[in-house]
Amino acid sequence: METHVSLEGTVQGKAATLRLVGQTLEVILNKKETWLQVPVELVLDVSWKSPHLLISLLAPKRHSEHASRILTRDQWAQRHANKHVASLSLFQFRAHTYDGSSWANTVMTKAYDRTPARRRVLVICNPSSGKGHAKHVLEDLTKPIFQAARFELDVVETTARGDAFRFCTTLDVSRYDIMAFVGGDGTLHEAINGLASRNDAVRALSIPLVPIPAGSGNGLYVSLHGAEIGFSAPVACLTAIKGVPYSHELMAVTQPLDAFGSSGRWPYTLRKTTKDGRGYVQFYSFMSQAIGIMADIDIGTEAWRFIGDIRFTLGYVFAVLRNKACPIHVDAYFGASGTASHASMYECARQTPVRVLQRNGQLQHSSAILHHEQMQPHTHMGTTKDLPSDVHRLRFGTVLDELPMSPTPFDPTSASHPPSDVWTRIHTAVSTVYTGKVPYVARSLLAFPYTC
């Protein structure tokens, strides 16, 4: 049965009716003017202390507090492609009433029907990320929203490369329900590798991780929320507050230890040795891996951070004009012809935002998104029993190990399909290799549309 509860009072000195109609919160002034109408999912907190009712929520931004704020359920249902959602900002108002306790409890129950309210969040901020606006995103957007939702909030700011990694290696993860990251994808990358390097990596990696966009590309954020709504910190905070976790596979990357020189410049890796004593480093990637042009675009445009994500487009143009060859061997493992069609791959990718934690036997981390599942307070996702005891074990060994290779290299210009179920060397000139696990690596680059 659809919920329909009303409360009479005054708002901004006008007679007001506050209504919860199904999944929509409304405020009607003078019995005729719809001053506020938003999906109940946008409600952060409702508290009553006679005679005042304080309501905190996200609503479309307006220049005047007297202007109406309306976001329909249809607009919210299409939020991944609706620019109206990009205008959401924190909005708080008071209603004067003498009997608001029951109404407040009803709205809060509806607003948090999938996740507990008032949980504990750790925010890690990298002030140097992107254009350098992360501090503003933290102080003016992130903190006020979490505080309005009455979350227990701790904040850590990084000051140097590797800080997020080092902090996460010793973090007491049991103190938090969620970790949020104000910065770019690199900040989250450091944190994941810090959590993965711990003795309790399986448990540490079960805490939900949420990106709050303040970097250059913000690929994970865009992949989760869509490119249309831009870099919306309020939407990201809402995800942290009300999102239900889903699993996201991590990719293991290995490189010879001597590739980094004697200084050991790479701070966040697992350093190990092969059976014959050769050293290598192992780390984890959640988004993309690049060699050649695509790597040069990222690393080679570090000095252009101040121009935002357009730095990648300019870097690509210059790299293509140079067309520098990449002297590497590429070995690939192909499935059988017809294993997956474009249609099935697209459907799998389309369902990514509604996957919950179901995969077994893999090292994985979680990124919170909105999903219709129930989550208990102060608990992580309980997957440790399904993961192997050696979470860092590699199925095909390291970059230093020999692979079971097909005797015949594959020429991609030929009409034949490559051999299946065996490693095959690709015989062609290469300028770049680019692989990934999320669709977008930046707003303007849908690099991997069929990832899932």
Summary of predicted features, one role per range:
Residues 190-192, 221-222, 444-445:
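Short glycine-/acidic-enriched loop or helix-start segments at secondary-structure transitions
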Residues 1-182, 189, 193-203:
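ATP/NTP phosphate-donor binding region
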Residues 182-183, 288:
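Conserved residues at beta->alpha junctions
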Residues 62, 130-131, 292-296, 439-443:
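Short, acidic Gly/Pro/Ser/Thr-rich loop/turn segments
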Residues 129-130, 161-163, 187, 217, ...:
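Surface-exposed, flexible loop/turn segments at secondary-structure boundaries
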Residues 158, 173, 195-438:
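Catalytic core of DAGKc-family lipid kinases
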Residues 58, 424-434, 441-452:
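Non-catalytic interaction/regulatory modules that flank or connect domains
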Residues 126, 185, 213-215:
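Active-site glycine-centered loops adjacent to acidic/histidine catalytic or metal-binding residues
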